[in-house]
A protein has these predicted regions:
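Internal active-site segments that recognize and position negatively charged phosphoryl groups
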Residues: 150-180
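Short, solvent-exposed secondary-structure boundary/capping segments
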Residues: 128-135
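Active-site glycine-rich loop that binds ribose-phosphate moieties when present
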Residues: 136-159, 184-186
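Short glycine-rich anion-binding loops that position phosphate/pyrophosphate groups of nucleotides
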Residues: 15, 137, 167
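Non-cytosolic beta-sheet module surface loops
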Residues: 136, 163, 218-220
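A glycine-rich beta-to-alpha transition motif near the start of alpha/beta enzyme domains, typified by
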Residues: 1-126, 170-290
Length: 290
């Protein structure tokens, strides 16, 4: 039998967008794309939408220069092993873990991500809500109109292209089409022109529910359909606000896994609010050859 390597892990989720957290404070873990795929496999591994490696900035060569600004770097990987700039739900789970383990000295902190420094706040006596500063949405108009078609459907839908900071194509459904009628979104939607997103794109399908209230489903690049997407919720809320000026400062976004809230700051920046749960901890074993 092949020798195995024991690796501690924690399982958590933000509105059912679930993650495997790997505490690696000293930055010693060799987290290959193959290992990420194995961890996220819901039959062979633990199962998750992505992996969050928890490492101190001082021990990560890429972020050591930021150690005086942020103590921890959120190394986020998609389920297919690819790197991602940011994950709003993952950031909430990441901060929830730091708070639960006593790694935070206060309820406000800054974490490092590939998208830059991100402010976070823990709210509630039982940390019922985590707030993540998502920054400003970048409108990214393309030289050609963006359209989306779901495999198996004939309808071609217009999309709005934005970055939060990872790329999103946001589709608002016409009144004649309901979110529940779209069927599974595990297969990547057909986005045209394909060269618009050379590294892939997250696609949100959105419906208006009421004033400052929308519901959404999402196909995440490198993952498939997920129960929630934090950056996607921000992208959808931002596009909704451009379509009809908001009367308030907060959008409610319903996703299959629950509800999150997107707050609009006066300077154009967005905050993502919602729950984060830690549900299990243990040790995972994989063959050294993996």
């Amino acid at each position: 039998m092949a020798r195995v390597l024991d690796v501690p892990f924690v399982k958590g989720h933000g509105t059912e967008n679930d993650f495997v957290l790997l505490p690696d404070f000293e930055g010693r873990l060799d987290l290959t794309a193959e290992r990420v795929r194995w961890l996220c496999d819901r039959r062979k591994g633990i199962g998750a939408d992505g992996v969050l490696r928890v490492v101190r900035c001082a021990h990560d060569p890429e972020f050591a220069d930021y150690a005086d600004v942020a103590e921890f770097f959120m190394d986020y990987r998609n389920a297919d092993g690819s790197l991602a700039e940011m994950c709003g739900n993952g950031a909430r789970v990441f901060v929830r873990y730091l708070h639960a383990t006593g790694a935070l000295s206060s309820r406000t902190t800054v974490i490092a991500t590939r998208a830059g420094m991100v402010a976070a706040e823990v709210r509630g006596t039982e940390a019922e809500e985590i707030v993540i500063g998502m920054g400003a949405v970048v409108d990214s108009p393309q030289p050609l109109p963006i359209t989306v078609r779901i495999p198996g459907h004939e309808t071609v839908m217009d999309a709005t292209s934005v970055h939060v900071p990872n790329p999103h194509a946001v589709v608002f459904l016409e009144d004649t089409l309901d979110l529940d009628e779209l069927g599974p979104l595990d297969t990547p939607p057909v986005v045209t022109p394909p060269q618009a997103y050379p590294e892939g794109v997250n696609v949100e399908f959105v419906q208006h529910v009421g004033p400052e209230h929308i519901r959404m489903r999402v196909h995440e690049r490198g993952v498939g359909e997920t129960r929630s997407c934090g950056t996607g919720a921000c992208a959808a809320a931002w596009v909704a606000a451009t379509m009809s000026p908001a009367t308030g400062d907060t959008y409610r976004v319903d996703v299959p896994g629950g509800t999150v809230f997107v707050d609009f700051e006066s300077d154009g920046r967005l905050n993502l609010r919602g729950p984060a749960e830690l549900v299990a901890r243990g040790t995972v074993q994989w063959p050294r050859g993996l």
